[in-house]
C-alpha cells in the first residue's frame, strides 16, 4: 500500500507541479541588464549593498560560464540567442568573412552579419509581443525584416539614468507597451581595461557607481509600480584578467607583416595567411611560450569555435594575462577574450521578480542556458539553441524539479526497490522456525480440571 501511494505521489508531482509557462494572466515582462566586464568575484571583493539587496530578494548565480571567445559582441549575442559563437556567426568584435570577403567592425549595422541567428527580441515580436532595447549590441540592426518597437541607438554619451528611464517609460506607456527589454552599460569593462581588475582603489570607485546604478533601477521600478511584476536579470558578458606592459607578444618579432593579415587581436588573434599557410603556422608556433597556435581544424571542440567561415585559418590564444599585438606597445592593464574555462573570464547572474525564487543561490550555469530561461519566462517558443532549461530551472518558483521522464525513472526504481524488499521479507519468513500462535493446554494429573 505504501509503495502504491509513493508511486501515485511521484506521478502527481511530475504531472501537475511543474510550471511549463508563467501562470500570470497578464503578459509576463522581463528586463535583462548587462554590465560589461563584470567579473564574478567582484561581488566578494567589493561592497555592493544595492546588488546584495537585489540578490537577497531574488537569486544569485556565483559564476556564469560564457562562450569562447570571451569578448563583448560574441557573448552578448549568445545571451540573446542561446548559441555558441560558431553557430550565431558573431565570432569576434572584428571579423573577416572568407566566403564574402567582407570585413565587420563593431559599428557595422548590415543585417547580413547577424542573420545567421535570431535574437530573442525578434522572436518575442514575431509571437505577438513588443520588445525594446537600450543599446544592447546588435539591437539597432533590423534583423529578419523586424524592427524593434522601441530602441536607443548606441551612444556612449547617453547616461545610465536615461537608459533606465526610457525602458520604464516603454514598459508603462498606455499604447503598445513592451514586455521585454535589454539594457547595456559599458562599465566596469572600460575601467577594468584601463586600471586592471587588481587595482582595488580605482575598481572600488567604478563598482560603487555600478552598484548605485542597480539601486537606481530598483527605485525606478518601485516608483513605477513594476518592482513586484517585472522580472529582472542582471548579468555580464565576460570578466577581466590582470595584464602588464611587460607581458606583450609582438608578432612581427617572429614573422614578417607581409606574410599575414591580423583580423582580430589581443588576446585572441585571428590570422589570415597571405603566403604559405604551413610556413606562417610554423613561424608562429615557435613565436612565444605563452601563446598557443591552432589550425582552424585543430581548435579544441570544447570551445565550439571552428565551424564558421568567419573563423580564420589560424587562431592564436595567449595565456592568461598576456596580450598579442603586431608590433606596438599596449597601455591597458586589463583584458579579456581568453579561454572560457578561466574563472577570471566568468561573469555572474542575479535575478529578481515573480518568476524567480527568493534568497536562492546557485554555483554555476552556462550562459547559453539564459536564452531558454528567458523564453520560458516570457511564455514564448524559443528557436533551436545550445542551451537547456533543465540546468537552470531551479532558479524559478513553482518547479518540482521532476519532469515526466525523470518521474518514470523514479517510479521504475521505486518498484525495483519495493520488489527487492518484498522478496527479502518472504525469504526471511521462510527461514524463521514455525511457531503456533496458540498451543494446546497440557494438563498435569494434579491440575484441577477446568470443567468439573
Curated annotation (Swiss-Prot):
Glycosylation sites: 24, 98, 107, 145, 149, 157, 166, 259, 327, 386
Gene Ontology MF terms: bis(5'-adenosyl)-triphosphatase activity; metal ion binding
Positions bound to Zn(2+) 2: 189, 193, 336
Keyword Transmembrane helix attached: yes
Cellular component aspect of the GO annotation: plasma membrane
Cofactor: Zn(2+)
Active site: 72 (amp-threonine intermediate)
Keyword Transcription regulation: no
Assigned EC number: 3.6.1.29
Cofactor note: Binds 2 Zn(2+) ions per subunit.
Taxonomy, superkingdom: Eukaryota
Gene3D superfamilies to which the protein is assigned, alphabetical: 3.30.1360.180, Alkaline Phosphatase, subunit A
Endpoints of the signal sequence: 1-19
Positions of Zn(2+) 1 binding: 36, 72, 237-238
InterPro entries noted in UniProt: Alkaline_phosphatase_core_sf, Phosphodiest/P_Trfase
Positions bound to substrate: 93, 154, 189
GO annotation (BP), single: blood coagulation
Family: Belongs to the nucleotide pyrophosphatase/phosphodiesterase family.
Protein name: Bis(5'-adenosyl)-triphosphatase enpp4
Lineage of source species: Eukaryota, Metazoa, Chordata, Craniata, Vertebrata
Gene name of the encoded protein: enpp4
Amino acid at each position: 500500500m505504501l509503495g502504491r501511494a509513493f508511486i501515485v505521489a511521484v506521478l502527481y508531482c511530475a504531472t501537475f507541479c511543474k510550471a511549463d509557462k508563467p501562470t500570470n494572466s497578464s503578459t509576463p515582462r522581463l528586463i535583462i541588464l548587462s554590465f560589461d566586464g563584470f567579473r564574478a568575484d567582484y561581488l566578494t571583493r567589493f561592497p555592493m549593498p544595492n546588488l546584495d539587496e537585489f540578490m537577497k530578494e531574488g537569486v544569485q548565480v556565483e559564476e556564469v560560464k560564457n562562450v569562447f571567445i570571451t569578448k563583448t559582441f560574441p557573448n552578448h549575442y549568445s545571451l540573446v540567442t542561446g548559441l555558441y559563437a560558431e553557430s550565431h556567426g558573431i565570432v569576434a568584435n572584428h571579423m573577416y568573412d572568407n566566403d564574402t570577403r567582407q570585413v565587420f567592425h563593431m559599428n557595422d549595422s548590415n543585417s547580413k552579419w547577424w542573420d545567421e541567428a535570431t535574437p530573442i527580441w525578434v522572436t518575442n515580436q514575431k509571437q505577438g509581443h513588443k520588445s525594446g532595447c537600450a543599446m544592447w549590441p546588435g539591437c539597432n540592426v533590423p534583423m529578419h525584416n523586424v524592427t524593434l518597437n522601441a530602441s536607443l541607438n548606441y551612444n556612449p554619451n547617453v547616461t545610465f539614468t536615461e537608459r533606465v528611464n526610457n525602458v520604464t517609460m516603454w514598459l508603462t506607456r498606455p499604447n503598445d507597451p513592451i514586455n521585454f527589454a535589454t539594457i547595456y552599460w559599458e562599465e566596469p569593462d572600460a575601467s577594468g581595461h584601463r586600471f586592471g581588475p587588481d587595482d582595488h582603489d580605482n575598481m572600488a570607485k567604478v563598482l560603487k557607481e555600478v552598484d548605485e546604478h542597480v539601486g537606481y533601477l530598483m527605485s525606478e521600478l518601485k516608483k513605477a509600480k513594476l518592482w513586484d511584476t517585472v522580472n529582472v536579470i542582471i548579468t555580464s558578458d565576460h570578466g577581466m584578467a590582470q595584464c602588464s606592459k611587460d607581458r606583450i607578444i609582438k608578432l612581427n618579432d617572429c614573422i614578417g607583416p607581409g606574410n599575414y593579415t591580423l583580423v582580430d587581436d589581443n588576446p585572441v588573434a585571428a590570422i589570415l595567411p597571405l603566403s604559405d599557410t604551413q610556413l606562417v603556422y610554423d613561424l608562429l608556433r615557435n613565436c612565444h611560450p605563452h601563446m598557443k597556435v591552432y589550425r582552424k581544424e585543430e581548435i579544441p571542440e570544447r570551445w565550439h569555435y571552428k565551424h564558421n567561415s568567419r573563423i580564420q585559418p589560424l587562431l592564436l590564444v595567449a595565456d592568461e594575462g598576456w596580450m598579442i599585438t603586431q608590433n606596438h606597445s599596449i597601455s591597458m592593464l586589463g583584458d579579456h577574450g581568453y579561454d572560457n574555462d578561466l574563472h577570471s573570464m566568468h561573469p555572474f547572474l542575479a535575478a529578481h521578480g515573480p518568476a524567480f525564487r527568493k534568497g536562492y543561490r546557485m554555483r554555476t550555469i552556462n550562459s547559453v542556458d539564459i536564452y531558454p530561461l528567458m523564453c520560458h519566462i516570457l511564455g514564448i517558443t524559443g528557436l533551436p539553441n545550445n542551451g537547456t532549461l533543465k540546468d537552470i530551472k531551479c532558479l524559478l518558483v513553482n518547479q518540482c524539479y521532476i519532469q515526466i521522464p525523470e518521474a518514470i525513472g523514479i517510479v521504475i526504481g521505486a518498484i525495483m526497490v519495493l520488489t527487492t524488499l518484498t522478496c527479502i521479507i518472504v525469504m526471511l519468513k521462510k527461514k524463521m522456525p514455525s511457531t503456533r500462535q496458540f498451543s494446546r493446554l497440557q494438563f498435569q494429573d494434579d491440575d484441577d480440571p477446568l470443567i468439573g
